[in-house]
Curated annotation (Swiss-Prot):
Residues 72-147 form the ACT domain. This is UPF0735 ACT domain-containing protein Helmi_18680. The lineage of its organism: Bacteria, Bacillati, Bacillota, Clostridia, Eubacteriales. Belongs to the UPF0735 family. Coiled coil: none annotated. It comes from the Bacteria. PROSITE patterns: ACT.
Amino acid sequence: MNDGGKRFYLVDGDILPEAILKTALVNEMLAKGEVTKVSEAVEKVGLSRSAYYKYKDGVLPFREPGRSNIVSVSLLLEHHPGILSRVLNTVAAMEGNILTINQSVPEKGLAPVAFVLDRSRMSVDLPRLLAELRQLTGVRSAQLVGSEEE
């Protein structure tokens, strides 16, 4: 791939030098807020600061093209104790991260729920998650409403 004179490569992480991999880890730690200082992050991963600064702007995470990591899901739940809790536990068990959630007032025994999900670290695909949610007792429906544009 060529972008303004720069050349980019998609490379299997297994063949990258250790300094590049550790630089990617440091960038991730800083982005997630796990650490606040570069010196703290490089010490944790065992990388020199000079190596980090040499590679930091050249190491970017790969996002699968066409796959949106932020999705909106709509549910219709029966109004009984514990149903929403089971939904949240199911999402968490699959390593999904709920960013926002909204539950409306139940009408006729049913409560609409909508949540926005970061699925970047999920251990299963979205159709499997929706199928698992639909199988839960008290979940009348679960559907994808939308996703962020790539």
